[in-house]
């Protein structure tokens, strides 16, 4: 699978990182684990997993968990790719609406998002622009 300018070895490393992050999920309520990995412009991989809470509104998705790691390391832009996986063998897991809006804040429209099933045997690639067409973003506030 070719994804943007990402090398095959980088994409495989991203997939492995997302699958491993999924194992670190804290999801005692939904029992649906999600993992995410992000490749930065200097080829560093950051990961995150969903973390649930008894007060459901306090849960955080894997995508935002990973993005916070990236942002706290000082990488505000220029990310290369995101990979998401979750506990569905039949379907590739896509970002929820909140995560789509959050991701949109920091990436360009052609930013590739690779969605995997639980084993990584199925994949679908979409861009941020495809996942959130006509997105509301920072330019609307100028």
Swiss-Prot record:
Cofactor needs: Zn(2+)
Active site (record annotation): 63
Keyword terms: Hydrolase, Metal-binding, Zinc
InterPro entries per the UniProt record, alphabetical: APOBEC/CMP_deaminase_Zn-bd, CMP_dCMP_dom, Cyt/Deoxycyt_deaminase, Cyt_deam_tetra, Cytidine_deaminase-like
EC numbers for this chain: 3.5.4.5
Top-level taxon in the UniProt lineage: Eukaryota
Domain CMP/dCMP-type deaminase, residue spans: 9-139
GO CC terms: cytoplasm; cytosol; nucleus
One example GO MF annotation: identical protein binding
UniProt keyword Protein biosynthesis, yes or no: no
Reaction(s) catalysed by this chain's protein: cytidine + H2O + H(+) = uridine + NH4(+); 2'-deoxycytidine + H2O + H(+) = 2'-deoxyuridine + NH4(+)
GO biological process, one term: cytidine catabolic process
Residues annotated for Zn(2+) binding in this entry: 61, 96, 99
The keyword Plastid is annotated on this UniProt entry: no
Binding site for substrate: 50-52
Additional remark text: Present with 3120 molecules/cell in log phase SD medium.
Subunit relationships: Homodimer.
Family under the similarity heading: Belongs to the cytidine and deoxycytidylate deaminase family.
UniProt-recorded name of the protein: Cytidine deaminase
Biological classification of the source: Eukaryota, Fungi, Dikarya, Ascomycota, Saccharomycotina
Gene this protein is translated from: CDD1
